[in-house]
């Protein structure tokens, strides 16, 4: 964010959920953003705030100074809150073969995702109407997935496990001047900052100087990833997930079932601890 500000970008930060909760974005990523607005000013419930957020973004974009570039951050909340508008259609049927309660909630979740997608459509249509779409990098992602006990292990929601359903997120990048493509290798949110700094701002330093990731357009491979929650973290490898608690650990297989035969990956754990300590102050 400091580099973005140094390049004269106008900042439009809009969040449906308070950005000071849990991850403290107001004290980390947006610590130096002037006049930072903490949350959407109005709206009935998460879906209402998401709609207002979209209106406010479109209004802000129309009033910004056209001579300077802009950076927008739009944080939608209806999907994670599982709160689509009561009158929203279509309703997306749930594929989960589970209890009626889980099927009903999964239907609400998928419908909420469809609703947020419709709001993103408004954002993209507005950029196109202003003839800005082909001059704007657009990144769509999420901070986590949502689980509905697909594995039958009893895990639901988010922040309850390091399963595929909770860790996998969308990551869609529209980059003017680049041909459409698909990245098949494992990627991480840690790759977004190095991508922007190297590919947009021309940073010549190796990404390891300032981040734990690498450019999405490089061929760098992750042999392991660190995924963290509020009290524990996991080292994720292709064949296993090692969850480290304050007073112990557990090793799980690809299906996230507890493994009694696999041993903890000592080299990967050591490297993960060293990597996590590099930027800790």
Residue ranges and their predicted role:
Residues 2, 19, 125-131, 173-281:
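Membrane-interface soluble catalytic domains
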Residues 19-26, 41, 79-86, 146-150, ...:
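Short catalytic/ligand-binding loop motif for oxyanion handling, primarily in non-cytosolic enzymes
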Residues 48, 103-116, 159-167, 178-194, ...:
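A short beta-strand-to-alpha-helix junction
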Residues 54-64, 94-136:
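A long, amphipathic alpha-helix that forms part
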């Amino acid at each position: 964010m400091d580099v973005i500000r140094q390049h004269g970008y106008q900042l439009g930060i809009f969040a449906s959920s308070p950005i000071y909760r849990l991850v403290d974005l107001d004290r980390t990523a947006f610590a130096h953003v002037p006049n930072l607005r903490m949350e959407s000013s109005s709206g009935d419930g998460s879906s209402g705030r998401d709609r207002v957020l979209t209106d406010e973004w479109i209004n802000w974009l129309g009033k910004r100074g056209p001579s300077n570039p802009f950076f927008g951050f739009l944080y939608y909340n209806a999907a994670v809150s599982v709160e689509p508008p009561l009158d929203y259609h279509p309703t997306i049927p749930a594929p989960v073969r589970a209890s009626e309660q889980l099927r009903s909630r999964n239907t609400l979740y998928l419908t909420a995702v469809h609703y947020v997608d419709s709001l993103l459509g408004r954002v993209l249509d507005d950029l196109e109407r202003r003839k800005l779409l082909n001059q704007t990098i657009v990144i769509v992602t999420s901070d986590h997935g949502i689980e509905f006990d697909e594995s039958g292990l009893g895990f639901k929601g988010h922040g309850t496990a390091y399963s595929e359903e909770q860790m996998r997120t969308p990551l869609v990048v529209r980059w003017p001047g680049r041909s459409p493509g698909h990245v098949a290798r494992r990627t991480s949110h840690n790759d977004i900052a190095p991508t922007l700094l190297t590919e947009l701002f021309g940073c010549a330093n190796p990404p390891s100087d300032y981040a734990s990731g690498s450019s999405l357009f490089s061929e760098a491979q992750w042999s392991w990833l660190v995924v963290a929650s509020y009290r524990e973290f996991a080292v994720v490898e292709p064949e296993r997930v090692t969850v480290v608690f304050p007073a112990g650990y557990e090793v799980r297989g690809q299906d996230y079932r507890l493994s009694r035969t696999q041993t903890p990956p000592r080299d990967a754990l050591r490297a993960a601890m060293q990597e996590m300590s590099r930027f800790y102050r």
